[in-house]
Curated annotation (Swiss-Prot):
Chromatin-associated protein involved in DNA repair by promoting homologous recombination (HR). Binds double-stranded DNA (dsDNA) and secondary DNA structures, such as D-loop structures, but with less affinity than RAD51AP1. The modification Phosphoserine is found at residues 14, 19, 54, 58, 61, 73, 75, 79, 113, 130, 132, 144, 181, 204, 214, 223, 229, 234, 240. The gene is NUCKS1. Residues 91-100 have a biased composition (Low complexity). The modification Phosphotyrosine is found at residues 13, 26. Residues 35-51, 149-174 have a biased composition (Basic residues). InterPro entries: HR_DNA-Binding_Protein (IPR052003). Does not interact with RAD51. Its main location: nucleus. This is Nuclear ubiquitous casein and cyclin-dependent kinase substrate 1. Keywords: Chromosome, DNA damage, DNA repair, Nucleus, Phosphoprotein. One of its GO terms (cellular component) is chromosome. The modification Phosphothreonine is found at residues 179, 202. The keyword Chloroplast does not apply.
Length: 243
């Protein structure tokens, strides 16, 4: 590949050639031209950046100062507001406590007045019913005495029961007493019938409790009956058959 040929301009330096005197005059009149130091593009960029950064830093610092001032003002306002709020809350609490205490006092006064009225109303009723109340108390005492009397009666009944049992205990039967009967024929003693003997043998418990035994009967019971002869026994059998 062949490279393209560049266009080149031909410069004629003859046009710019002047006399030596002119050069000398020019050199005397004007001093050597001051050379300007060209700064590299990197340095220019750095300067621009540094300038921008400095401006940004200054703006940031100003904004920060403004913010700090605002914050200080806000904090002062907030502190004042908080103080006022605390004061308001305290005042509200104090007012609520005072109102509650007043309500309690009013209620206590109302209750006390009602109780006084009730006591005044109940006083005449109590005076009227005092006698009946005493009677009622006496009746209560009577009831208590009645309960104690019941207990005493129960104790007495319990004590009397064993005595009755002792009375009911069977006593030894008394032996039949032999009494002489009127003579029927030939002047001989007749023997009592079996029915009479049985009646005499079984006395009633009432009679046993009421009538004490006589000493004669005890002696007769202790002595054995007399023995009879054979003739008397036959006569007794005949009499029982006739009956």
């Amino acid at each position: 590949m062949s490279r393209p040929v560049r266009n080149r301009k031909v410069v004629d330096y003859s046009q710019f050639q002047e006399s030596d005197d002119a050069d000398e005059d020019y050199g005397r009149d004007s001093g050597p031209p001051a050379k300007k130091i060209r700064s590299s593009p990197r340095e220019a960029k750095n300067k621009r950046r540094s300038g921008k950064n400095s401006q940004e830093d200054s703006e940031d610092s100003e904004e920060k100062d403004v913010k700090t001032k605002k914050d200080d003002s806000h904090s002062a306002e907030d502190s004042e507001d908080e103080k006022e709020d605390h004061k308001n809350v305290r005042q509200q609490r104090q007012a609520a406590s005072k109102a509650a205490s007043k309500q309690r006092e009013m209620l206590m006064e109302d209750v006390g007045s009602e109780e006084e009225q009730e006591e005044e109303d109940e006083a005449p009723f109590q005076e009227k019913d005092s006698g009946s109340d005493e009677d009622f108390l006496v009746e209560d005492d009577d009831d208590s005495d009645y309960g104690s009397s019941k207990k005493k009666n129960k104790k007495m009944v319990k004590k009397s029961k064993p005595e009755r049992k002792e009375k009911k205990m069977p006593k030894p039967r008394l032996k039949a007493t032999v009494t002489p009967s009127p003579v029927k024929g030939k002047g001989k003693v007749g023997r009592p019938t079996a029915s009479k003997a049985s009646k005499e043998k079984t006395p009633s418990p009432k009679e046993e409790d009421e009538e004490p035994e006589s000493p004669l009967e005890k002696k007769a019971s202790s002595s054995p009956p007399p023995e009879k002869s054979g003739d008397e026994g036959s006569e007794d059998d005949a009499q029982s058959g006739e009956d």
